[in-house]
Regions:
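Extracytoplasmic gate region of multi-pass secondary transporters
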Residues: 28-39, 143, 222-238, 304-306, ...
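Long, low-complexity inter-transmembrane loops of multi-pass membrane transporters
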Residues: 192-322
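Central cavity-lining transmembrane alpha-helices of secondary-active solute carriers
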Residues: 52-73, 86-92, 96, 156, ...
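Hydrophobic core of transmembrane alpha-helices in multi-pass small-molecule transporters
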Residues: 90, 102-124, 328
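Extracellular/periplasmic helix-loop-helix junction of adjacent transmembrane segments
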Residues: 11-12, 34-69, 76-80, 352
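Glycine-rich segments within core transmembrane alpha-helices of 12-TM secondary carriers
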Residues: 51-62, 136-191, 205-229, 363-366
């Protein structure tokens, strides 16, 4: 991404589009039910052993704390590369086993590779969320809602693409999980960077909010498109191919925002080549002295809600622990259901449970989008 494109203001929007694409392919933690039955039959596992494999996958996300610490000292591109390589190894090993290209690995080895696959998404999530929230400090709620919404949709995207083109084959599904995120993350390293954001006037803030409404609208259209494909039953080969093409077009549609921003606000030559002449002597800032009492007060002052916190400042707040306990108690039940969706469907007599996984993903997306918009309304 050239300096002209970055300075024009479209650079951070292109970075957001790259982040959306990363999120659209990194929801692989929620796809275990698509291939869990294949692992169970191939490795002759009991239901308890299969559940422990899903736990190993979820434990990988618990190590996401490492990605959070690393985000303060490593650039976005390095975080994305770590996540893509880890996912390629973790899901690649599972693909080799399910496709019978190698002999089944031992149980503990499979636990390690599932843990790696689960942890890979934390690096991708951290990279895009931290970078985009720093690029859009006044719209953190919409940014979070959009990016986490696409994570929810990613399960439906993977599931429906695999169903449309490969008839829900577990080995092909795992191959896609291993390769596609690696390709997208490596591509995103060229576009997703932290861009210094100058103070905006009210007009620019309104325009930024309008752009986020466009992103939300595109995401909702994509969700409805996936929902329509799921509820319309079986499709022929031609319709499935048409669906796949339409899905790729919808995923590319967010590019219209940075393109419009680039065309509508081009930089003039004077903005680039002629620096502003500023007197070095006139308008010198007045020096002020700070008393010891005032200095101690400034050092003790904590950032308010909505401002950047260090990790130490964060764990000292009551709000963090409320969120932590709520997340700890609430997410586990949902993950338990999603991990066992395949076994539940088979127990109820369904040979293909992909539609249930996809529908769960789509409705999860609507909840994520709503939470981002509502939280932004009350915080700002």
């Amino acid at each position: 991404m050239g300096p002209f494109f970055s300075l024009s203001g479209a650079g951070k929007w292109l970075g957001l589009v790259a982040a959306i694409w990363v999120q659209a392919i990194c929801g692989n933690n929620y796809t275990f039910a698509n291939y869990s039955d294949a692992l169970k039959s191939l490795m002759s596992l009991t239901q308890l052993q299969l559940n422990n494999l899903s736990v190993a996958k979820d434990v990988g996300k618990a190590f996401g704390l490492v990605a959070g610490f690393a985000s303060d000292c490593l650039p976005t591109s390095v975080l994305l590369i770590i996540g893509s390589v880890e996912g390629l190894i973790g899901y690649g090993a599972q693909w080799l086993v399910v496709s019978r290209r190698i002999h089944p690995l031992t149980y503990w080895q499979m636990c390690v590779f599932l843990c790696m696959g689960g942890n890979s998404t934390t690096w991708m999530n951290t990279a895009v969320l931290v970078t985009c929230m720093r690029n859009f400090p006044k719209n953190r709620g919409p940014v979070s809602g959009i990016l986490k919404g696409y994570v929810g949709l990613s399960t439906a995207i993977f599931t429906d693409i695999c169903t449309a083109l490969f008839s829900s084959d577990p080995s092909t599904f795992l191959f896609i999980l291993a390769v596609v995120p690696a390709i997208v993350c490596l591509t995103a390293t060229f576009f997703l960077h932290e861009i210094p954001t100058p103070t905006k006037n009210p007009t620019e803030l309104r325009q930024e909010t309008l752009y986020f409404h466009v992103f939300n609208g595109i995401a909702i259209i994509l969700a409805v498109y996936l929902l329509a494909f799921d509820i319309t039953g079986n499709h022929g080969r031609v319709l499935s191919l048409a669906f796949a093409v339409g899905l790729l077009v919808l995923l590319a549609t967010p590019l219209s925002v940075p393109l419009y921003s680039f065309i509508s606000k081009p930089l003039s030559d004077s903005d680039i080549e002629r620096p502003m002449k500023v007197s070095l002597l006139a308008d010198q800032p007045k020096t002020t002295t700070t008393t010891g009492v005032e200095l101690q007060y400034l050092e003790r002052k904590r950032p308010s809600i909505g401002e950047d916190h260090t990790i130490v400042e964060m764990i000292r707040t009551f709000d963090f622990w409320v969120l932590f306990v709520s997340f700890l108690c609430g997410v586990g039940t949902g993950m338990c259901v999603m991990n066992n969706m395949g076994q539940m469907g088979i127990a109820l007599g369904y040979l293909d449970v992909s539609i249930f996984i996809s529908l769960t993903s789509i409705w999860g997306f609507f909840g994520r989008i709503a939470s981002g918009l509502i939280s932004e309304y009350y915080i700002w």
